[in-house]
Amino acid sequence: VMIGDRAQLQPIDAGKSFSLIQSDNPAMARIDTSLRQRTEHMKEAAGLVRAGMFKESFASLGERVVEAGADHDKVTAQKWLELSPEDRERTAIYSSGRAARGELNRMVQQGLKAEGAIQGEGLRLTTLLPAHATREELRYASTYSKGQLLEVTRQNAPGGLVRGRYDVEGIDAKGRVMLRDESGKLIKFDPAAIDPSDKRDALRLSEKHKETIYEGDKIRWTEKDDARGLMKSEEARILGIRDGIVTLENKAGETVELKQNDRMLERMGLAYAINMHQAQGDTRDMAIGEMHSSARHLS
């Protein structure tokens, strides 16, 4: 028995396989009623989207849809900031892309800082966000760009890479990826050497981002730490920052301390806005969606 949704975002391998299988018209049962939408207007809008009637779906939402032009990020952030503290806790901002997510988080954080909801001098961090590259995409030099981080999680990885971390320096004239290892040595890596039949996830590509966190900020984990009850995609609240030590409350209500150089300090990001990849599987009572007409697949 296989269960899947061919409408999943394209970079997800499982979604692609279900789309291919269904294109051959196998015997299958369809579940056309979504249980995630609870209100009548959202049930109607979701049903129209599944039917490919996008214009009609937006029209059914009426005044709930706001066209804000070039100021759509600013208007979205302001809509969330106008909510009561109780409604903020149960309202997510869904963004159509990673750039919009970063901008929305910054705007919301600035608004919270101005009203005193978050406090302190803040702690500047370099965080890592998944590049969402599939195994096949990792075989092409065009997937890599300067400033990214490549993590090799096992020995005898493709291209002779050993376990460790590598900074992506760029692409040379022969299409090889220039990597700098943890000792500072420059290595030329040919991604085409990756065996397409190798299903082991030996490589993980991430993008570096600068984040500032304050006391009271809401963050979201991009990786897990089972021992401390920090689960990927779950949210946590920053309780305090002192002498470089971050004290937070995890989803279970437990207090956790992260000292300087703790690997989980780079595996977090602000959680006021999340993009469409992060939103898969996320269910909220209320939501504010930001989308741009150019982001057709993500919107």
What are these regions (language model features)?
Residues V1-S299:
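Conserved ATP-binding/catalytic motifs of P-loop helicase motor domains
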